[in-house]
Amino acid sequence: MKKITLLKMQGCPYCAQAFAAIKEVKAEYREFADMEVEIIDKKNDERAKDFEGKYYYVPSMFIDGEKVYEAHPGETYGECLLNVKKVFRAAI
């Protein structure tokens, strides 16, 4: 299984949406239930430096360091959910 990393920012409504989508995907699909997501706060975590220049918006999700999903302003929960599913499928 590949490593999933999520970059977030405290107070970001799209990040909250992504966390809800992750919870929903893990509950709905048994094969994703035990998958772990490394969470990195872009402002308060030194590990965020490893991702500089690879994204603009948060949340952004990476598989083994490669960006697979980046939210955009105005993104709906449905869009987020589809993208989170895509990330989890790609990480298997």
Model regions and ranges:
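Local sequence-structure signature of Cys/Sec-based thiol-disulfide redox active-site neighborhoods
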Residues: M1-E28
